Amino acid sequence: MSMRTLPLLFLNLGGEMLYILDQRLRAQNIPGDKARKVMNDIISTMFNQKFMDELFKPQELYSKKALRTVYDRLAHASIMRLNQASMDKLYDLMTMAFKYQVLLCPRPKDVLLVTLNHLDAIKGLIQDSPTILHQVDKTFRQLTDIYGGLSAGEFQLIRQTLLIFFQDLHIRVSIFLKDKVQNSSGRFVLPVSGPVPWGTEVPGLIRTFNNKGKEVKRTEFKHGGSYVAAPKEGSLELYGDRVLKLGTNMYSVNRPVETHMSAASKNLASQTQESIVPNPLAKEELNLLARLIGGMEIQKPSGPEPGFRLNLFTTDEEEEQAALTRPEELSYKVINIQATQDQQTNQELVRIMGEFEITDQSRQSSSKGDDWLAMMDEL
């Protein structure tokens, strides 16, 4: 497992989330000023410098449910609200899109170019805010400084870590099905055409060398595909040509997007029940995640501006039906707990929360699990 995977996972999934929200805000004809506020608020929260500093520290990946909690908080960082079914669908679309991109990366290192494509597109979603643009550019430099010099082996380990994270997800997405890159079981179809990885040759030729390293024979073979040489290597510069198209906004053409659980995924969900035995690693993960989310500085809606609900389904009826048919094990419920405000009951939590930039000094609580959940609700 690579300790450098989390920033790439978070930024790419966050980019996909912003693509989807932008498309739905336009599809539902949300007024321009409200849509602009939502996008700017979420992007500003996502690229908060304190949060980025925590994110880029070497660390293991969080569980799917823990990471989902981060995006739930992030999606509600402004005046927009999503109900459970829409949030489930949003997360399904995000994860399947990035899984597809990781699978199709020609080289393991190209996952960095995919990330830069997301950052480039995110900057295009920012309106009238040079400060937020500067936040994204700073993260861009942080990303290239850390990952630009990694070896091919280190990127291979990152790619393997990502694929392990995604390995049990087989959710059908209408865009992928229509483009024939996903089959009815929810698995992706790998192409046998297109550019080969940069630095490699088009298959079809075998060279034989003698013991002195001199080429003595060439044999051609049919590879069964339609490959071409890569035109050039993607740039890591701020305004460079990434060449690779993976990670760009596939929702720029306005079309509805549906998700469906495959039969295999439903069967897997029905067989996989949450264990009631406490996980000994859960406390450590909660503490780490609390530190990570503590840097997000999520703003509460204030003032007279009313909030609004965004629906990721075509109609409210579809949304309600999706909530009823989704397997219980695949829903990520957020628990809200009203915890007591006793500052002396948990010295460890007091120490951790002292590192956060929280204006309300009275936000303290009792038991460890409840403390963490209450803190999440307060952010």
From Swiss-Prot:
Coiled-coil region: none
Entry keyword Cell membrane: yes
Covalent S-S links between cysteines: none
Annotated keywords: Cell membrane, Membrane, Transport
Any single Gene Ontology cellular-component annotation: cytoplasm
One Pfam family here: Oscp1
Subcellular location: Basal cell membrane
Source species, domain of life: Eukaryota
Known role: May be involved in drug clearance in the placenta.
Name listed for the protein in its UniProt record: Protein OSCP1
Name of the gene encoding the protein in the UniProt record: OSCP1
